[in-house]
Amino acid sequence: MSFDAEKQLAIAAVRRASYLTEKVFNQLIKEKSAAGALTKDDKSPVTIGDFGAQAIVISMLKDAFPNDPIVGEEDSDFLRENTQTCSRVWELVQETIQHATEYKELGQIKSAEEMMSIIDQGSYHGGRNGRMWTLDPIDGTKGFLRGAQYAICLALIENGKPVVSAIGCPNLPYDFNQPETSPKGIIMSAVRNHGCFQYSLHNEKLEPVQVHMQDVQNTKDSKFCEGVEAGHSMQGTQEEIAKYLGITRGPTKMDSQAKYASLARGDGDIYLRLPTKMTFEEKIWDHAGGSLLVEEAGGVVSDMFGKPLDFGVGRTLKNNNGVIAAYKGIFEKVIEATAAVTSKDPHFQKVAQ
């Protein structure tokens, strides 16, 4: 089955939402920081960006595919209780819609009340049968606040498997080999069995380029990446795994599913995310889109035990523990190394039981 209509709509929705998040950063973070008015604990720009991006994407999805349920991250309760924040979100949503150039007839939200109702349509419980979309409106909130990597992540799941993905990375250089001179902003998109492609975020006329992971066969030549936040994964154990594999260079640390996009185009070869708590369940919107990018670019994605990620059991990956992504040529070696290192650690033995 062709998913071209879904792919094109997903790219357009992610692009529109990315523009809104860039407005939020420039108006509410960059300017405030320059004026010394943004405190370290001020998370309001992320809140505004999250709600605005979710409203933009869901409104377009519901206009194009009204019967598809959506698993989103936010609901409107906070906005209904905070009218000032709601007004700011509504102002940015209106501004973004007015400047839209693609699918202009879609996502025409008429009021703040309609906007909040649309946000609430992301409350689907998930499941294994039929179609559903997953959305993370701003993945990597701390990266967003720092002006580093974050992502707008959208995926279509059919019968428990991701089949369409579009991930917007506004701060990822188009050419990772020339980060200082290459324009920032990409959208990475994939359709199952049809490859992974990189699009320019800001130049809609630029032809997409199919991307592939590096054909690395020796793990000592590979590059591995992990999240920035030490509390999100067992970084010490991950470093031990890298040493076991013969990797001598340090990890690339990056927030959000921009890591998956980077792997897909060959900027890295291995992504390790081992759980810090045995009971932690990864959210499906944090991995659905990114995992498909890597798989369509020549990689394999599983949990730390080599089990495929199961997106059909609700809003979380409750049947999995952690995440490992790697180029197919070295994937089994990475799983073997992970088993060798973690088998000695009671922390992970509890997970395996």
Swiss-Prot record:
Instruction: Give the phenotype of cells or organisms lacking this gene.
Output: Deletion of this gene leads to sulfite auxotrophy.
> Catalytic residues per the record?
50, 141
Keywords, in A-Z order: Hydrolase, Magnesium, Metal-binding, Nucleotide-binding
Q: What reaction is this protein's catalytic activity? A: 3'-phosphoadenylyl sulfate + H2O = adenosine 5'-phosphosulfate + phosphate; adenosine 3',5'-bisphosphate + H2O = AMP + phosphate; adenosine 2',5'-bisphosphate + H2O = AMP + phosphate; 1D-myo-inositol 1,4-bisphosphate + H2O = 1D-myo-inositol 4-phosphate + phosphate
Q: What residues bind AMP, as annotated?
A: 232, 256, 259, 273, 286
Supply the EC number(s). 3.1.3.7, 3.1.3.57
One Pfam family name is Inositol_P
Q: Which family does it belong to?
A: Belongs to the inositol monophosphatase superfamily.
Q: What does this protein do?
A: Phosphatase that converts adenosine 3'-phosphate 5'-phosphosulfate (PAPS) to adenosine 5'-phosphosulfate (APS) and 3'(2')-phosphoadenosine 5'-phosphate (PAP) to AMP. May regulate the flux of sulfur in the sulfur-activation pathway by converting PAPS to APS. Is also able to hydrolyze inositol 1,4-bisphosphate (Ins(1,4)P2) and inositol 1,3,4-trisphosphate (Ins(1,3,4)P3), but is not active on inositol 1,4,5-trisphosphate, inositol 1-phosphate, fructose 1,6-bisphosphate, AMP and ATP. Confers resistance to lithium.
What is the designated name of this protein?
3'(2'),5'-bisphosphate nucleotidase
Native organism is: Schizosaccharomyces pombe (strain 972 / ATCC 24843) (Fission yeast)
Q: Which gene encodes it?
A: tol1
